[in-house]
Design a protein with these regions (language model features):
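Short coil/turn linkers that connect adjacent helices within long alpha-helical scaffolds
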Residues: 19, 37-41, 75-81, 115-121, ...
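Conserved alpha-helical positions within TPR/SEL1-like repeat arrays
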Residues: 7-20, 26-27, 34, 43-58, ...
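TPR/TPR-like (Sel1-like) alpha-helical repeat modules
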Residues: 220-241
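Alpha-helical linker/edge segments of TPR/alpha-solenoid repeat scaffolds
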Residues: 53, 214, 218, 251-267
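Long, contiguous interaction/recruitment modules in multidomain scaffold/adaptor proteins
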Residues: 1-2
Length: 267
């Protein structure tokens, strides 16, 4: 009975999470955690703690997420859940990457990759390769990053992960943007946007719009950059994303710049 209650709460939390309603998702997971702690079911507890780690990670509560993931990892090692261990290692790598701890992130990712290769976990590996691509990009290894992204895209197609394909194309767009290869950056990002629209995935659409705004800004096409960034801020506001304030400030700076160049003050 307790397991069923925990499972139902986690399912409801997952539904909220998938829609970007993070506060409601956290509340469901927190209730499930109370049930699991009382019940003593280690597998159910590991699932709930993992979900709490995920929600804290996307909400910018990095240290809280790290604590949840660390407890999950201990439970998974006790239970011998190799697939779960690889996922949690990747999640810990993501937290390190978010903090700019690139060497630590890479170490977590490579440990996870070893397990995924052992398990022939192509779906997990496809995502992990994008993580390794991010580390390579941020540490100046852009050729290696592109190779990771291209290998990931092959696997994403193999396992039918369309959302993942949208992510990879957006990441390739950002990489090309960093290299000032603006045509390639825009092409990849528009492909990402097309996939996200087909999936009706507003969060991924927002991610693509953000890169497109940067592409147009790099070209000096301020009005187009503003149009895309306004869409980004709308998504940030709807889902209360962590970069709302930063993106709003960037939008205001662009509006001010356009107003100044046209001689018309912006209210």
């Amino acid at each position: 009975m307790a397991w069923s209650q925990s499972a139902d709460l986690n399912l409801l939390g997952n539904q909220h999470f998938s829609k970007g309603f993070y506060t409601e998702a956290f509340q469901c997971y927190a209730q499930a955690l109370e049930v699991d702690r009382k019940n003593g079911d280690q597998r159910a507890l590991a699932t709930t703690l993992g979900n709490l780690g995920n929600i804290c990670a996307v909400s910018g509560r990095r240290e809280q997420a790290r604590a949840y993931y660390t407890e999950v990892l201990e439970l998974q090692k006790i239970l011998g859940e190799d697939r779960g261990i690889s996922t949690t290692l990747a999640n810990l790598g993501n937290l390190s990457a978010d903090a700019g701890e690139w060497a630590r992130a890479r170490a977590y990712y490579l440990e996870a990759l070893d397990i995924m290769n052992m398990l022939s976990d192509y779906a997990g590996k496809a995502v992990l390769l994008t993580d390794l691509g991010l580390v390579a990009r941020e540490t100046g290894q852009e050729v290696e990053a592109l190779a990771f992204y291209q290998e990931s895209l092959v696997l994403m197609r193999r396992v039918g992960n369309e959302a993942g394909q949208a992510d990879v194309f957006r990441m390739m767009g950002r990489l090309y943007l960093n290299q000032h290869r603006l045509d390639e950056a825009q092409s990849c990002t528009l492909t990402s946007l097309d996939v996200a629209r087909r999936l009706k995935d507003e969060l991924r659409m927002g991610g693509a719009w953000y890169v497109l705004a940067s592409c147009h800004e790099a070209r000096g096409e301020w009005q187009k950059a503003i149009q895309y960034l306004q869409k980004v801020v709308q998504v940030d506001e709807k889902y209360q994303l962590p970069k709302l304030a930063e993106n709003t400030q960037r939008l205001q700076a662009l509006l001010t710049r356009v107003g100044a160049s046209s001689g018309v003050p912006h209210e």
